[in-house]
Amino acid sequence: MIDETAYIHPSAIVEDGAVIGANVRIGPFCCIGSQVEIGEGTELKSHVVVNGITKIGRDNQIFQFASIGEMNQDLKYHGEPTRVEIGDRNRIRESVTIHRGTVQGGGVTKIGNDNLLMVNAHIAHDCIVGDRCVIANNGTLGGHVILGDYVIIGGMSAIHQFCQIGSHAMVGGCSGVVQDIPPYVIAQGNHATPFGTNVEGLKRRGFDKDSLNVIRNAYKILYRNGKTLEEAQQEIAELAENNQHVKIFSDFLANSTRGIVR
């Protein structure tokens, strides 16, 4: 079904069964599969391919040569009906690739709202990206990676499969991340190691001085006081009883499956 207010360039191919919302614009030489749904106000520039069971929300901008919903690169995948879900107001720049999920990983690759995926970024199968994240040019997420909200991934950085990166964390450019990065932390290098808290980013998002101080304190307990991970987790868990930001930090440590960058 194609809404009467949608614009589709004569050279674009939209297969029967696709759902195209109001005021959608589909540019030259785009290819849209039969199981695709594109929400109101979303714009596809030129040469965009959207395939598979893919749902794209409202007011997204998708630039030329992006590929969304294509078969993933997991060797165990044999064409099962998995999908991609993308929220609202995302900017997906040139040559970005977003692959569909796997049955083993829950069946869905999911992108939230208000994200910026820069040129050549790759989102592998079963990744979950929160809201207001930035993945810079040539950034790569391996399969099953989870990003919290407001995460920044520097250019040419790669995140290993199954890693989690907490909200408001930042990964510097040209980094290789093989373990989980807690919320609010800056990490860089190959393999990535912590370099402090993302103070400037937190200030921009309205964190007050008291909140910044308790986050710094939690960071020092984990990284600067010579404690074992178990000792640090216990002390941070006690502080978390009285502060929501420390609770987020503490819960992330407790739920880590790949270990924490140290």
Curated annotation (Swiss-Prot):
Spell out the Gene3D superfamilies in the cross-references: Hexapeptide repeat proteins, Udp N-acetylglucosamine O-acyltransferase, C-terminal domain
User: Looking at its record, which EC class is this enzyme?
Assistant: transferase
Enzyme Commission no: 2.3.1.129
Tell where it localizes.
Cytoplasm
User: How is this protein annotated for GO cellular component?
Assistant: cytoplasm; membrane
Its main localization is: cytoplasm
Key word Acyltransferase present: yes
In its UniProt record, a GO molecular function of this protein is: acyl-[acyl-carrier-protein]-UDP-N-acetylglucosamine O-acyltransferase activity
Q: Which UniProt keywords apply?
A: Acyltransferase, Cytoplasm, Lipid A biosynthesis, Lipid biosynthesis, Lipid metabolism, Repeat, Transferase
Entries under InterPro entries matching the protein: Acetyltransf_C, Acetyltransf_C_sf, Hexapep, Hexapep_transf_CS, Lipid_A_LpxA, Trimer_LpxA-like_sf
Q: State any GO BP term from the record.
A: lipid A biosynthetic process
What's its job? Answer: Involved in the biosynthesis of lipid A, a phosphorylated glycolipid that anchors the lipopolysaccharide to the outer membrane of the cell.
Q: Fetch the PANTHER family from UniProt.
A: ACYL-[ACYL-CARRIER-PROTEIN]--UDP-N-ACETYLGLUCOSAMINE O-ACYLTRANSFERASE (PTHR43480), ACYL-[ACYL-CARRIER-PROTEIN]--UDP-N-ACETYLGLUCOSAMINE O-ACYLTRANSFERASE, MITOCHONDRIAL-RELATED (PTHR43480:SF1)
- Family recorded in the similarity comment: Belongs to the transferase hexapeptide repeat family. LpxA subfamily.
Quaternary context: Homotrimer.
Entries under HAMAP family matching the protein: LpxA
Q: What is this protein called?
A: Acyl-[acyl-carrier-protein]--UDP-N-acetylglucosamine O-acyltransferase
